[in-house]
Amino acid sequence: MAHYITFLCMVLVLLLQNSVLAEDGEVRSSCRTAPTDLVFILDGSYSVGPENFEIVKKWLVNITKNFDIGPKFIQVGVVQYSDYPVLEIPLGSYDSGEHLTAAVESILYLGGNTKTGKAIQFALDYLFAKSSRFLTKIAVVLTDGKSQDDVKDAAQAARDSKITLFAIGVGSETEDAELRAIANKPSSTYVFYVEDYIAISKIREVMKQKLCEESVCPTRIPVAARDERGFDILLGLDVNKKVKKRIQLSPKKIKGYEVTSKVDLSELTSNVFPEGLPPSYVFVSTQRFKVKKIWDLWRILTIDGRPQIAVTLNGVDKILLFTTTSVINGSQVVTFANPQVKTLFDEGWHQIRLLVTEQDVTLYIDDQQIENKPLHPVLGILINGQTQIGKYSGKEETVQFDVQKLRIYCDPEQNNRETACEIPGFNGECLNGPSDVGSTPAPCICPPGKPGLQGPKGDPGLPGNPGYPGQPGQDGKPGYQGIAGTPGVPGSPGIQGARGLPGYKGEPGRDGDKGDRGLPGFPGLHGMPGSKGEMGAKGDKGSPGFYGKKGAKGEKGNAGFPGLPGPAGEPGRHGKDGLMGSPGFKGEAGSPGAPGQDGTRGEPGIPGFPGNRGLMGQKGEIGPPGQQGKKGAPGMPGLMGSNGSPGQPGTPGSKGSKGEPGIQGMPGASGLKGEPGATGSPGEPGYMGLPGIQGKKGDKGNQGEKGIQGQKGENGRQGIPGQQGIQGHHGAKGERGEKGEPGVRGAIGSKGESGVDGLMGPAGPKGQPGDPGPQGPPGLDGKPGREFSEQFIRQVCTDVIRAQLPVLLQSGRIRNCDHCLSQHGSPGIPGPPGPIGPEGPRGLPGLPGRDGVPGLVGVPGRPGVRGLKGLPGRNGEKGSQGFGYPGEQGPPGPPGPEGPPGISKEGPPGDPGLPGKDGDHGKPGIQGQPGPPGICDPSLCFSVIARRDPFRKGPNY
């Protein structure tokens, strides 16, 4: 029990630390967390029907899933109405989205007439009026027909109570004037129409955005003739007070601010964006600058200075960066590098506009769309840091620049209405004209002109087409009671319902029988003084308690539970003898104290009956070796732990004997394609042979026995490169070889790391008490504990007692407090052994067990089944060009034709004649016999090898 209380105290300390972090602002603020009272008023009349009402419930579930439900965040209430309103879900009834979803799905359809005004008044009186939270209050009215009572007075009363009203009309039976009377102004923001209930899903995202704007963007920015929800960042950072110098933009009487490096434009984010930002918004800024460095026009930082959202201008690369949060890795950066972005750095006035949605961000410069980039889903922002404008990236130094406008609009549609009229020389459309810094433009009011002259009478028109069928009439009165129907077939059992509300406190139960003696109690605080109790039975001697810190003298009270060990206190004066305290827990070994006085010898107690066998205790700390005890009974086998992480390679074991062939295993998965083998060394030059005829497929050879692996040989000398042989023909595909015998058993691996702790097993039966062992020597001094203040310990233990005492009292371990009395009575007669008590609550997880002994070598596993046929190998490299010897010279040609007879008279020798023409080609000679083996010319071999490049594709010339 003491360990259990200590464990709970440690857990509470950690929870207190975490709660401090949460209170310091470590909560992401967004629409999900903005505190809001949100009430849905649903039409449940006859015209809706059960099927359409189910569609409405699914739509309501999809809307509320976007919010965090709880007392600190959004609370949802639901009212269904027909002839009368019904409170289906009160505000604050559920603290989680799952419970709220289950409650919405369990709402039953009413049916009846349409009394919308009565339902609005009911929500005002019984939901909003009973909410004690001073925050945003929103009501959404969904109806499909004209109300049968007045709605104006009830809606006006709700608006007077600062309740924002949305009206959703479904179908053609709704009246536009009635919906406008219900909703807030302007109706373009607070009134929605859909053609039927199936189409209601089309306005889900728009409705979610509008609800978000109401809860996150409470302020309004004057824009032309209407006020837009959003944030004027210049106003939120008090720029008009911090920056004294104003500048004139143009003759249009538009003024701006000249920011210097001496001004610090920073403010706490919680003051500027108290509830964070909506998921979709429009960022607009108008500025002029000359700086050529990287700086942040606007940024929201965490408490440790990390940017969450930022608009960064890179004057070096002339690009724009947008930083925002991300659910993937916390942050994401989008780069706009379009050539048109460079115009921002020409030292002139320009407007930057970023349309940020949940899917993407779009950049506009001077009212022209530049680029669109996708976004990952975003997170809410942390509001415990600062919001700044005009700072160098990563620094606190202010940039010198001029600024005229810096705003965030919560409505994405404002992107279509925004203009850049404040920029000098802007040629775009300016419907409402520019506005001055800090001024509110007046709406344009134009008086109507004079009536024109009456026109001539027109010709008679053609007969009109037949009209459309008339609209359905109003809901009829309830019909007469019908004849009782036959009993239906028993339905199938329904699904288990949601958990019910806590029941009322029951009547006090009768006094129970006296139970078995309980375990020693846990430490408690000093109680109030009580009346003197009756003489109780003498209790057993308890174990000594911890030495507590000396406390202030208090009033006399009843004996409390033993206290927790406290730090050693200063030596105090000798006080009076106190009352005998309750037995405490065994304390840690302390320093030897002064010899005490001899106490009186106690009376010997009556031997008790042998008790039942106790439960297995928790593992204690390792003490010094004790005396050899008796052999204990074998323990219960533990649960199988999870696989440990792979151990380090073990030392190679001795070669085992050859095992028997294993049983044929299951087919293994197809193996991966192997890497190409290394290129072999060139062989010796071969003879020049003729291409041989492809041989027949050979018979399948027998599987040879596996040889013993030889020792690694020494590296041989590098041989002379051989001549490349001619490329051979592709051989026929060989048959699949037989299965090999199983391999030799591998060496025993080293011991793996300890497995993950197993789950706590069920409590075993109560065992017999063992023989008491000899008392061991005192343990070593423990490490000094962490210092906690006495007030902190009291607070933690008070919380523990409040939370755990009712559970312990109901668990059956403590039936009464007879054993807590401190008076000594006469020893009672030992009672018979009590029955085995009920199974106790599940204990805390046990301490990790010792590392197990390495197991024996397992039996060799079955060999895997032969793998699937591998993919065809790569084509081999083309061989180098072969060479042959020149052929033998052919035989001489036949003699030419006989010339004409010469002159008989001998003349002088003539000049040499011209060379004769080549004779006809002779027939090829007969193939000669192969010559003897040639001798390789080293120069020729080198040239062949040099031409052979294994990485060259194509022939080698």
Curated annotation (Swiss-Prot):
Keywords: Collagen, Cytoplasm, Extracellular matrix, Glycoprotein, Repeat, Secreted, Signal. It is found in: Secreted, Extracellular space, Extracellular matrix; Cytoplasm. One of its GO terms (cellular component) is collagen-containing extracellular matrix. Induction: Stimulated by PDGF/platelet-derived growth factor. Residues 448-500, 501-542, 543-594, 681-733, 734-787, 825-882, 884-934 form the Collagen-like domain. Residues 448-786, 825-938 are annotated as: Disordered. This is Collagen alpha-1(XXI) chain. It comes from Homo sapiens (Human). The gene is COL21A1.
